[in-house]
Amino acid sequence: MAEKITIARPYANAVFELAQAQKNYDQWSRVLNVFADLARDSEMQILIDDPRYTSEQLIGLFVEIGGDTVTESAKNFIKILADNRRLSVLPEVAALFEQLRAEIEGTLEVEIISAKPLAEEQLNEIASALKRRLGREVTFSRKTDESLLGGVIIRAGDLVIDGSAIGKLNQLAASLLH
């Protein structure tokens, strides 16, 4: 959804600059993830999209549900989003914030999807190769998807490496059709 990302980018940049100035990336990561989870909730989405709910009511909900994680700066941030009817972009703001944070910290979150769970040795080899190629430390999230048949799919930011058996079969089928 390019439109939401476009809308979210200036907010993410502003929060990131504030987090840099305050030197509290962890606090902002926590609060943005709480807010993003709230904005993803189907019942909360109905309230966010309902024009009958005022920005003050929505701010109150986010602050109350956010609890102790909500600082005064975070409350002001939610107020800006609510006043501009932009609470629905919170998941994108959180994701962009984490990308900016990873960039500044020299890390990259990598998603590895494999047909079967990978051994530590295999993960270390993948990590080493990605570190050489991308020049950054990598952290993993792992998923298994038996429909891949074999191999792995690696997602690192905008980079997608499809080394799955099903991916190779799809490439072969596409080349035979053309």
From Swiss-Prot:
One function term, GO molecular function aspect: proton-transporting ATP synthase activity, rotational mechanism
Coiled-coil blocks: none
Subcellular location: Cell inner membrane
Record carries keyword Zinc: no
InterPro entries: ATP_synth_OSCP/delta_N_sf, ATPase_OSCP/d_CS, ATPase_OSCP/dsu
Any one Gene Ontology cellular component term annotated for this protein: proton-transporting ATP synthase complex
Superkingdom of source: Bacteria
Chief location of this protein within or outside the cell: membrane
Self-association and partners: F-type ATPases have 2 components, F(1) - the catalytic core - and F(0) - the membrane proton channel. F(1) has five subunits: alpha(3), beta(3), gamma(1), delta(1), epsilon(1). F(0) has three main subunits: a(1), b(2) and c(10-14). The alpha and beta chains form an alternating ring which encloses part of the gamma chain. F(1) is attached to F(0) by a central stalk formed by the gamma and epsilon chains, while a peripheral stalk is formed by the delta and b chains.
NCBIfam families the UniProt entry points to: ATP_synt_delta, PRK05758.2-2
Physiological role: F(1)F(0) ATP synthase produces ATP from ADP in the presence of a proton or sodium gradient. F-type ATPases consist of two structural domains, F(1) containing the extramembraneous catalytic core and F(0) containing the membrane proton channel, linked together by a central stalk and a peripheral stalk. During catalysis, ATP synthesis in the catalytic domain of F(1) is coupled via a rotary mechanism of the central stalk subunits to proton translocation.
HAMAP family given in the database record: ATP_synth_delta_bact
Entry protein name: ATP synthase subunit delta
Organism listed in the record: Nitrosococcus oceani (strain ATCC 19707 / BCRC 17464 / JCM 30415 / NCIMB 11848 / C-107)
